[in-house]
Amino acid sequence: MILPEPIHKVILVIIELGILLGSLGVVLLTNIVYSALLLGLVFICISLLYLVLNADFVAAAQVLIYVGAVNVLTVFAVMLIDKPKNITLFSFSNVGDNITLGVCTSLFILLTIMIPDASWSEIYMTKQSTKFVEQGLTTDVQLIGSQLLTKFLLPFELLSILLLVALIGAITIARQERIVEIDDNKASESKEDLSLF
């Protein structure tokens, strides 16, 4: 953004105050949900700082990656830390597990059948045509997008799979901890009931 010098300084001071106050709130608040939301405010202020400095792509990436990650952090914080007292277990949990197993197995078999039949020459032609595509790209954002979807497509997809596996692992760990805690609570309640007699 091209702004007059006094307005530029005022905007920078406001953004820096947002970063400073948000960071203090993240560290000093005891509620994990409020801390995560203030961390989102800090990341938004940092993206505004990049926007003022004419780094449009970095500002957009900051919002998409970090603010999106803060939403996931909020969900994990509530899921892993704020555990409710009374939980009723769903008795048909094996049905859901079996359905998930069936869907994943069928997708695996489908991909195993379709991958050998794919015409890889079209993918080769796509790589060859990037020379012509890059000639029409004028901005840095277009060049970065072109590189992400041609040259760095495999690392980009592997990173998304890694993040998905981490998400599934965190959900599984949180679920197992809750089940163990419920079993411990039931055992302690039964001991208390026996001590009454």
From Swiss-Prot:
Keyword vocabulary terms for this entry: Chloroplast, Membrane, NAD, NADP, Plastid, Plastoquinone, Quinone, Thylakoid, Translocase, Transmembrane, Transmembrane helix, Transport
EC number: 7.1.1.-
Catalytic activity: a plastoquinone + NADH + (n+1) H(+)(in) = a plastoquinol + NAD(+) + n H(+)(out); a plastoquinone + NADPH + (n+1) H(+)(in) = a plastoquinol + NADP(+) + n H(+)(out)
Cell compartments where the protein resides: Plastid, Chloroplast thylakoid membrane
Pfam families: Oxidored_q3
GO molecular function, one term: quinone binding
Transmembrane segments: 10-30, 32-52, 61-81, 95-115, 153-173
Coiled coil: none
Membrane topology label: Multi-pass membrane protein
Organism domain of life: Eukaryota
GO cellular component: chloroplast thylakoid membrane
InterPro entries in the cross-refs: NAD(P)H-Q_Oxidoreduct_6 (IPR050290), NADH_UbQ/plastoQ_OxRdtase_su6 (IPR001457), Nuo/plastoQ_OxRdtase_6_NuoJ (IPR042106)
Function: NDH shuttles electrons from NAD(P)H:plastoquinone, via FMN and iron-sulfur (Fe-S) centers, to quinones in the photosynthetic chain and possibly in a chloroplast respiratory chain. The immediate electron acceptor for the enzyme in this species is believed to be plastoquinone. Couples the redox reaction to proton translocation, and thus conserves the redox energy in a proton gradient.
Subunit structure as annotated in this protein's UniProt entry: NDH is composed of at least 16 different subunits, 5 of which are encoded in the nucleus.
PANTHER family linked to this entry: NAD(P)H-QUINONE OXIDOREDUCTASE SUBUNIT 6, CHLOROPLASTIC
Family: Belongs to the complex I subunit 6 family.
Name under which the protein is recorded: NAD(P)H-quinone oxidoreductase subunit 6, chloroplastic
Organism annotation: Angiopteris evecta
Gene it is expressed from: ndhG
